[in-house]
Amino acid sequence: MKFVVAAACLLGAAFAIQEDRLVSRKLNKRFIDDAGNYNISFYHINDVHAHLDEFSSSGTDCTKPERGCFGGYARIKTVLKETRPSHPDSLLLNIGDEFQGTMFFSFYGGEKIAETLNQIGFDAMTLGNHEFDRGDDHLGEFLENLTFPIVSANIVSDHAVLNRTIKPFHIFPQYDLAVIGVTTETTPGISSPGKGTKFTDPVAAVQDTIDLIRSTTNITRLAAITHIGYDEDQRLARETTGLHFIMGGHSHTPLGDFEGAVGPYPTIVENKDGDEVFIVTAYRWGEYLGYIDVTYDAQGKVLAYHGAPIHLTNTTAQDEDLQEQIDEWRGPFEEYAKEEVGFTNVVLDQSTCQQKECLLGDFVAE
């Protein structure tokens, strides 16, 4: 096995993928040919937290573009519009936590988020813990407005809408591929699901789902979209068999070849059979759009990969139509947001609150 640096930027310099960050790996001991091997491209995003619009480095509204503006679904739409036509065998997957984080959720709930996700054209989504912040009824309304499947194998609910709309997996027959979803089992302690909505062990749920798919279908290609966190993704990889590719979220973990990254993209872990499992995630808030080509063999193992997170900065154009829509949605809450309720002499930065004690957390808790 060896790592090599790609000679050219797959998606173009316009999307800020540096050549030294676009990494590909092929397994020398296996020969890749047309007999049962299949290549598919995955775009993935996680933990957007209602950042429909661009934002500053701290996650707040971008009021000083000269200091850098990042993310926003108008930039994501541009990247997809300009790259997906040349990657027809591709899936766009959402790893959850679209709710909670900006006025787009505080003011509108899930309404404008659903409109945006449908317009972007996601192929499937798993749920994050924050999707339950306003309870099962609100989540149910959101799910009924979506135009793509929702997958989470470890959610068991007696809520009629959740029970009907959330499935353990979804098969994409055009690719002979099944996508399995799971949600952190800590959700009841950190969000507000109904009493009749339960979260089981994600590792057991994924293995049971793999076994079900393998025993009832001819599908061998599997991928998991997991809102359980980077450490739990690695545990999932180690403690299961038959799964070779995981796209994760929840822990806001930066992976890749750039300053601040905590691991490689992908991270490779061996499963119970000693086979490799490839794990990717795309940080937070939509600052990065994950992108990776994966070649599966006939048994569903990953032969090769090629890709890197796409950094969405000022250099990435915004789709004008979607940005105009987002700007219009801002109107009703702009005056509300301007109401002064207090004053601070220091910046109450919340960007590190998930990793350590932070000023905003101290202010709220104390």
Where are these regions (language model features)?
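Fungal secretory targeting signals
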Residues: M1-E19
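Acidic, metal/ion-coordinating pockets
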Residues: I17-T313, L360-A365
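Hard-cation-handling environments
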Residues: I292-T295, K301-E366
